[in-house]
Regions:
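N-terminal Rossmann-like NAD(P)+-binding subdomain of aldehyde/semialdehyde dehydrogenases
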Residues: 1-117
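Conserved small-residue-rich beta-alpha loop and adjacent elements
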Residues: 101-163
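Alpha-helix C-terminal capping segments
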Residues: 136-147, 165-167, 185-191, 209, ...
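C-terminal core of ALDH-fold dehydrogenases
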Residues: 301, 306-419
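Short, low-complexity intrinsically disordered segments enriched in A/P/G/S/L with frequent Arg
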Residues: 423-424, 429
Length: 429
């Protein structure tokens, strides 16, 4: 049964979330080096060993994509179209605005937005195939305008291949694990070198992304999935169902409920046991519930949000809008009793590729911005440069960079006067 703990137990939960990457890094280092040195030859060996590849290339033929697409049921196609429409709509909301405006006479500042050239999406296919992750990683890239989108999946899952074809993805590779990350990071004759690799994966995928972050852009290093729910008087059946929905992902997943009500805590614990009885994924979910999950009793909902901010959960469920202003750190927030986390996993629109293990303190989920470069632009008139010349040359010479100062003076004919320096602020303001 799930543990019911006092809020003072939160530090123990935080300590147990540390990603176990050190051992995995030792395993993947030789794989990365082999792919870097030997390219396709090493990649094929690993793909045959780990990914059940039975062909002479990791590239999936277009005919296979078309065949998989033709085999999709109407129900599945409709589900993809519904989810894709919302994912695309949300991604469009995130596109940065291009601008160029005059901030002072003759000085124009702005930015232009450009997509990355090549992006690789990693789609896990271990315990569960994830066509939803294909949509979450590919659609924002399409909205961003990335011209070359590649997909890697360890197995030829019909739903993944068919969804790729529905979305118009043409370059799909049957490869997984660290070898797939290395292939995209270094490039081979078959696999193009990517500017950025996105998408979740096993601990070995995470370790490979971490080690190669200096050679290729990545989204973030993701650990086991997690949800934190805050509720004082929610429906026990709903809360238990949401916790199990997270727990069934992985034995290392974490589901945490923070509540002010001991009665609710006991009711949810009982509901979890009842719902586990006929859950097909109970073997996995039960281990996650027993090992990494808990119901914690707090004094107030305000304390619950404070603890949540310390935890910085991947998914955060709160009862209503009143707590949202207090939320500082979360990958994605679900508000109200009908905003189940499963909606975000599949079809509501916001991305489900989210930071875990406290990384939500630093960033949110995968977004269009991960596929774009925002390039600053500036235009100065002769008069604007003359106005800024005293500041530029003074700062340049203070740093010992005389050529910088002269590059201004050669255009302005020397300094056009000096402004009276401001006094330094005093301690009392």
């Amino acid at each position: 049964m799930i543990r019911i703990l006092p809020s003072t137990a939160m530090p123990r939960l935080l300590a147990r979330r540390t990603a176990r990457l050190a051992e995995a890094e030792g395993v993947v280092r030789p794989i990365l080096e082999a792919v870097r040195v030997h390219g396709d030859r090493a990649l094929l060996e690993y793909a045959r060993q780990f990914d059940a590849l039975d062909r002479k290339t990791v590239a999936v033929p277009a005919a296979d994509l078309q065949r998989a697409c033709a085999g999709l049921s109407t129900e599945f196609r409709d589900a993809v179209e519904t989810a894709a429409a919302n994912i695309r709509a949300f991604a469009r909301m995130q596109v940065p605005v291009e601008t160029l405006r005059e901030v002072s006479p003759g000085l124009q500042l702005g930015q232009v937005v450009r997509p990355l050239d090549t992006v690789a999406a990693y789609i896990p296919a271990g315990r569960y195939p994830l066509p939803s992750t294909l949509m979450m990683t590919v659609i924002p890239a399409q909205v961003a305008g990335v011209p070359n989108i590649c997909v890697a999946c360890p197995r030829r899952v019909p739903e993944v291949l068919g969804t790729a074809r529905l979305l118009g993805v043409e370059r799909v590779f049957q490869m997984g694990g660290a070898q797939a990350i290395a292939a995209f990071a270094y490039g081979t004759r078959t696999v193009p070198r990517a500017d950025r690799i996105v998408g979740p994966g096993s601990i070995y995928v995470a370790a490979a992304k971490k080690l190669l972050a200096g050679d290729v852009g990545i989204d973030f290093v993701a650990g086991p999935t997690e949800i934190l729910i805050i509720s004082a008087d929610g429906n026990p059946r709903h809360l238990a169902a949401d916790m199990l929905a997270q727990a069934e992902h992985d034995v290392d997943a974490a589901a945490i409920l923070l509540t002010t009500s001991k009665r609710l805590a006991n009711a949810v614990a009982q509901q979890i046991e009842r719902q586990l009885v006929d859950l097909p994924t109970a073997a996995v979910a039960r281990k996650a519930i027993q090992r990494n999950s808990a119901i914690m009793l707090v004094r107030s909902l305000e304390e619950a949000v404070e603890l949540s901010n310390r935890f910085a959960p991947e998914h955060l469920s709160i009862p209503d809008d009143r707590l949202l202003a207090r939320v500082q750190h979360a990958g994605s927030v679900f508000i109200g009793p009908f905003s189940t986390e499963a909606a975000g996993d599949y079809a509501s629109g916001p991305n489900h590729v989210l930071p875990t293990s406290g990384v939500a303190r630093l960033r949110g989920g995968l977004s269009v911005g991960d596929y774009l470069k925002v390039i600053s632009v500036q235009r100065l008139s002769r008069e604007a440069l003359a106005t800024l010349a005293p500041a530029i040359t003074t700062l340049a010479r203070a740093e010992g960079l005389e050529a910088h100062a002269r590059s201004v003076e050669v255009r302005t004919g020397g300094l056009r006067g000096r402004r009276r320096p401001r006094a330094c602020p005093t301690a009392d303001g």
